[in-house]
């Protein structure tokens, strides 16, 4: 099967590199190029053969159609042509000339474009409106402008003027295409069109102002390409003729008063090139085209056409907006103000760039916004923000600095303000988080510091404040962005206030702990001496108690003031603390005194004092009462001396009034937990009321009487002792029994066992425990006897009255004495 057609179709659909180079070669005849394009049309679409990769789908674009409408597709096409991101690294060239003079063919040969060319057999208009196509050999936008002097428009020159104005405002180089034989003619050489160009140029750059020298970007190069040059007329003559014609046209223009002396070279540079006849001399034509192309591509050549002075300084990504604005003003016949158009373009593009940059900036900042809002301190946030700002401004500067400088600077300031406003909540949030964390760390530092042995609270607080401030300032300075009006002094002042509040609270707590510790020490130092003094009451008892109290309080105050220096307490705080300490110490003394003046304690003290006087002599030896002793006198003396001590417990009454302490104010108790009732200074020195004294006196007298009866009974029992002769009777009568025990083995063994047991008990020291057990048993037996006696003598009124009295818990000896007293009375009756 013959597959040649299929292979040919594949080659046309995906032409090899050699075919593409052949199609792009300017020396390839138009007829051959057109034939290949027609063959490729069914596979790759019209007009794509021989175009570079970036422009395969859309090699050219009609930016202004025959209805004078500007296209909306210029920006997408610039992107397809890989020119949208070139910045200023691109050039624009346009061609003028009469209709059907080979302008499109010239552009296709020079730049490798794909503009439609005229069908030579029909000689009719080919280019309608304004077309644009990228160069194959450089970053150049080529505009093919509809030819002038065409029969289709006739005498309507409106579009010629508009296209000239548009091209002059947009391009760097104007190529004027004319035949050699047209030089010297007015209409044939497009002198009318050139006059229009000059007039338009004056309208654009010469209106108003006193400056006769245009700015560099206001200059344009006019390149005359002389076609079908056969060499009969030297090129220098042709150049001179065209230059003279240009100057004559320039001089004939009606100029403003301030531009009367303006010369052509201030606004235009003239350049010339000649091409041989395309049909008669095709090889030389192609060589001349290649040479001319070098002037557009080789920057090292002296005659390089795209000089910086000609560039309109419009970034590539703003070309579409700029040209559309130019055309709209041209279309509405308004005065075209290029600087205004450039400013409008700059505003539009700067706003677009700013929006894109700001959105990217917000996306970057989003990653830390949530942690900051959650209360966390983000490490290195300042560096991150500065990096975001630098990146955003770098992108903006890269893309927007190409536009109008004043607009760019203004928009940059606006963007910077927006960026700063967006970062300000992060700055404030970071400061608040630093504030919160530093206050927490400060509290922990104080708690840890007061646990150290021998700590100085003032040093701990100052050191903690210093560290907290240093950490806060370091974090605040790190997060502060340059060129902002952000301040952290207010937050620092709030931090200082919070640190002071925390320090004051901790100082109050530590002061309270110190006062409590001193109070406990005061209690320990007061309570024991008070108890000792009141257990041995004398007339100077209160002097001893109050002197001890005064010394302890004075030492406690000195200890407090010594420690309070490190707390930086104020005089008012010291006064309050000392008042609290004195009040608590006084209340502690009062409670101890009330404890020592309770009924049981006072009775015990009186009984002990009475017994020491009644039962013991001056040498402290226990008394054994004999019949000749005056027991009544001793009893009365001991009783009276003891009762004389009872009033000492009634009031705090030192021998010197100066020993009485200063009472705390009559306010609620300082020790609410122990005594929630208010302090009453009117009863501060009263311990026992008169009623209480009478009750204690009565109870003591009963105890003393019981002691007297016991002493009396012991003296009677010592008088009624066993006679001596009774012992002789016992020996005589018990002799036989004793002999029986000694000579009876069983009884003798029992006696030996008892003797050995007694010896062992004495040697092991068990006599005391055995006697204690025996006394307990005897006490129980005695209680049973007393109970039986009560039952037996229940009918006797006096015995019933005495036995009905409650037994106090003073001691078992008191109960015994009362029982003996009852039995003695019963025996007397």
UniProtKB/Swiss-Prot annotation:
Protein name: Protein SEY1
SUPFAM superfamilies assigned: P-loop containing nucleoside triphosphate hydrolases (SSF52540)
Family: Belongs to the TRAFAC class dynamin-like GTPase superfamily. GB1/RHD3 GTPase family. RHD3 subfamily.
Pfam families documented for this protein: RHD3_GTPase, Sey1_3HB
Enzyme Commission number: 3.6.5.-
Domain GB1/RHD3-type G: 87-310
Topological type in the membrane: Multi-pass membrane protein
Subcellular location, record wording: Endoplasmic reticulum membrane
Top enzyme class: hydrolase
Coiled-coil region list: 487-525
Disulfide-linked positions: none
Biased composition annotated in UniProt, kind: Basic and acidic residues: 814-829
Keyword terms of this UniProt record: Coiled coil, Endoplasmic reticulum, GTP-binding, Hydrolase, Membrane, Nucleotide-binding, Transmembrane, Transmembrane helix
Taxonomic lineage: Eukaryota, Fungi, Dikarya, Basidiomycota, Agaricomycotina
Main subcellular localisation: endoplasmic reticulum
GO biological process, one term: endoplasmic reticulum membrane fusion
The organism of origin for this protein: Cryptococcus neoformans var. neoformans serotype D (strain JEC21 / ATCC MYA-565) (Filobasidiella neoformans)
């Amino acid at each position: 099967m013959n597959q040649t057609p299929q292979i040919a179709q594949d080659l046309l659909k995906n032409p090899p590199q050699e075919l593409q180079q052949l199609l792009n070669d300017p020396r390839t005849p138009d007829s051959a190029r057109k034939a290949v394009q027609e063959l490729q049309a069914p596979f790759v679409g019209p007009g794509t053969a021989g175009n570079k990769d970036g422009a395969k789908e859309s090699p050219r674009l009609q930016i202004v159609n025959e209805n004078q409408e500007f296209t909306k597709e210029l920006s997408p096409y610039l992107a397809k042509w890989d020119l949208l991101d070139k910045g200023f690294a691109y050039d624009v060239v346009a061609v003028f000339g009469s209709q059907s003079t080979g302008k499109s063919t010239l552009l296709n040969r020079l730049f490798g474009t794909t503009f439609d060319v005229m069908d030579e057999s029909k000689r009719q208009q080919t280019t309608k409106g304004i077309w644009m196509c990228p160069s194959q050999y450089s970053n150049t936008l080529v505009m093919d402008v509809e030819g002038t002097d065409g029969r289709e428009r006739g005498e309507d020159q409106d579009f010629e003027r508009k296209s000239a104005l548009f091209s002059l405002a947009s391009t760097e180089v104007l190529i004027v295409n004319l035949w050699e034989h047209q030089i010297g003619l007015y209409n044939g050489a497009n002198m009318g069109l050139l006059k229009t160009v000059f007039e338009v140029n004056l309208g654009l750059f010469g209106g108003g102002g006193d400056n006769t020298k245009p700015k560099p970007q206001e200059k344009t190069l006019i390149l005359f390409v002389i076609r079908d040059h056969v060499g009969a007329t030297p090129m220098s003559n042709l150049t001179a003729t065209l230059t003279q014609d240009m100057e004559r046209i320039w001089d004939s223009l009606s100029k403003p008063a301030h531009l009367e002396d303006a010369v052509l070279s201030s606004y235009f540079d003239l350049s010339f090139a000649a091409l041989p006849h395309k049909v008669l001399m095709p090889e030389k034509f192609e060589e001349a085209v290649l040479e001319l192309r070098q002037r557009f591509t080789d920057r090292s050549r002296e005659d390089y056409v795209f000089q910086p002075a000609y560039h309109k300084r419009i970034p590539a990504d703003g070309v579409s907006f700029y040209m559309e604005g130019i055309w709209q003003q041209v279309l509405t016949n308004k005065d075209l103000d290029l600087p205004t158009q450039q400013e409008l373009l700059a505003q539009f593009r700067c706003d677009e760039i700013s929006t894109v940059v700001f959105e990217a900036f917000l996306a970057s900042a989003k990653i830390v916004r949530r942690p900051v809002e959650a209360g966390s301190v983000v490490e290195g946030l300042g560096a991150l923000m500065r990096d975001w700002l630098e990146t955003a401004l770098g992108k903006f500067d890269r893309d927007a600095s190409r536009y109008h400088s004043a607009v760019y600077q203004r928009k940059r300031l606006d963007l910077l303000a927006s960026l700063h406003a967006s970062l300000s909540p992060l700055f404030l949030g970071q400061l608040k988080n630093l504030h919160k964390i530093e206050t927490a760390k400060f509290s922990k530092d104080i708690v840890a510091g007061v646990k150290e042995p021998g700590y100085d609270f003032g040093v701990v607080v100052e050191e903690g404040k210093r560290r907290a401030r240093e950490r806060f300032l370091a974090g605040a300075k790190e997060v502060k962005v340059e060129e902002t009006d952000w301040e952290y002094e207010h937050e620092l002042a709030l931090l200082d206030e919070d640190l002071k509040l925390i320090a004051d609270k901790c100082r109050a707590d530590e002061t309270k702990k110190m006062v409590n510790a001193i109070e406990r020490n005061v209690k320990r130092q007061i309570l024991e001496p008070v108890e000792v003094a009141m257990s041995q009451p004398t007339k100077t008892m209160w002097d001893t108690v109050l002197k001890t109290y005064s010394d302890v309080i004075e030492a406690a105050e000195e200890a407090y003031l010594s420690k309070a220096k490190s707390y930086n307490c104020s005089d008012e705080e010291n006064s309050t603390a000392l008042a609290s300490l004195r009040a608590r110490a006084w209340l502690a003394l009062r409670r101890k005194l009330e404890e020592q003046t309770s009924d049981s304690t006072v009775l015990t003290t009186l009984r002990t004092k009475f017994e020491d006087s009644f039962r013991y002599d001056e040498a402290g030896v226990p008394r054994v009462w004999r019949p000749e002793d005056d027991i009544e006198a001793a009893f009365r003396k001991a009783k009276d001396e003891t009762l004389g001590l009872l009033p000492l417990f009634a009031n705090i009454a030192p021998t010197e009034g100066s020993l009485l302490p200063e009472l705390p104010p009559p306010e609620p108790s300082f020790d609410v937990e122990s005594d929630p009732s208010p302090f009453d200074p009117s009863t501060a020195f009263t311990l026992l009321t008169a009623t209480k004294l009478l009750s204690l006196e009565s109870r003591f007298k009963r105890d003393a009487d019981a002691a007297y009866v016991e002493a009396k009974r012991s003296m009677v029992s010592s008088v009624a002792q066993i006679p001596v002769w009774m012992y002789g009777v016992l020996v005589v009568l018990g002799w036989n029994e004793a002999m029986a025990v000694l000579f009876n083995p069983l009884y003798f063994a029992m006696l030996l066992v008892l003797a050995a047991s007694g010896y062992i008990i004495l040697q092991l020291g068990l006599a005391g425990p055995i006697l204690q057990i025996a006394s307990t048993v005897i006490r129980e037996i005695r209680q049973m006897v007393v109970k039986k006696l009560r039952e037996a003598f229940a009918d006797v009124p006096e015995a019933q009255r005495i036995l009905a009295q409650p037994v106090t818990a003073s001691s078992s000896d008191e109960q015994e004495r009362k029982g003996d007293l009852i039995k003695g009375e019963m025996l007397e009756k």
